[in-house]
UniProtKB/Swiss-Prot annotation:
GO terms for molecular function: rRNA binding; structural constituent of ribosome; transferase activity. GO terms for cellular component: large ribosomal subunit. Residues 39-49 have a biased composition (Polar residues). The gene is rplB. Belongs to the universal ribosomal protein uL2 family. This is Large ribosomal subunit protein uL2. NCBIfam families: rplB_bact. It comes from Cupriavidus metallidurans (strain ATCC 43123 / DSM 2839 / NBRC 102507 / CH34) (Ralstonia metallidurans).
């Protein structure tokens, strides 16, 4: 994997920086693990925009990734190849199990074709293997961590992501996330050893607005250039300041304001990610 700065043959390529991984498969993805993916464009079932700045973009097939990895315990597996996935920042690996079944998983850092993998409590503590947290040594770097047993990985799934197992106490373990938050999870929750691969993803430079549109991301208009009917920062004669602290279009403070409202799981957070 390497960062490649393109030659300035056009304004769009002048500042472009690409992440090149020669180990990625160059052919078609594994067809049985593909599903149709329909454009939502940030709309809900009523057609109302629930997520702004989404729409357009290239068509993608969804790659069915196994985030649970709990029904192949003790079965030897081998990484067949690494692949690009347009639906996420991390790369994925096509894994062949000894019983003949193939599945996609999130590729960990250092994973290569031909590497042996195993799931379950008997698996060795080696990057790419998936185990219950009760069988993972304290201090181990992990990724693809479950929050609820059997629900599938929800934490540390993006490129370069990881968490650290800090402690085990009774039925719960403490996991420190990249944000600094320390969270309690049940020891029957599963996690994968190591960090997520494609860690240089955050260093890429897209280079031009059109490439962002290919990814289905639409422009973000500043509130200060809108009319008062559209945004609290809008209005004024000529170019004017917002006249107040930064807020969202709905008046919620935009800088440092806590919006977490799920009190039911507050007891599972040992240390918040906020400094104050």
């Amino acid at each position: 994997m390497a960062l490649v700065k393109t030659k300035p043959t056009s304004p769009g390529r002048r500042s472009m920086v690409k992440v090149v991984n020669k180990d990625l498969h160059k052919g078609a993805p594994h067809a049985p693990l593909l599903e149709k993916q329909f454009q939502k464009s940030g709309r809900n079932n009523n057609g109302h925009i629930t997520t702004r700045h989404k729409g357009g973009g290239h068509k993608h097939h969804y790659r069915v990734v196994d985030f649970k990895r709990n029904d192949k315990d003790g079965i030897a597996a081998k990484v067949e190849r690494l692949e690009y996935d347009p639906n996420r920042s991390a790369n994925i690996a096509l894994v062949l199990f000894a019983d003949g079944e193939r599945r996609y998983i999130i590729a960990t850092k250092g994973m290569v074709a031909g590497q042996a993998l195993m799931n379950g409590s008997e698996a060795p503590i080696k990057a790419g293997n998936n185990l219950p947290i009760r069988n993972i040594p304290v201090g181990t770097t992990i990724n693809n961590v479950e929050i609820l047993p059997g629900k599938g990985a929800q934490v540390a799934r993006a490129a370069g992501g990881s968490a650290v197992l800090l402690a085990r106490e009774g039925l719960y373990a403490q996991v420190r996330l990249r944000s600094g938050e320390v969270r309690r999870v049940h020891i029957e929750c599963r996690a994968t050893i190591g960090e997520v691969g494609n860690e240089e993803h955050s260093l890429r430079v897209i280079g031009k607005a059109g490439a962002t549109r290919w990814r289905g991301i639409r422009p973000t208009v500043r509130g200060v250039v809108m009319n008062p009917v559209d945004h609290p920062h809008g209005g004024g004669e000529g170019k004017t300041a917002a006249g107040r602290d930064p807020v969202s279009p709905w008046g919620t403070p935009a800088k440092g304001y806590r919006t977490r409202s799920n009190k039911r799981t507050d007891s599972m957070i040992v240390q918040r990610r906020h400094k104050r």
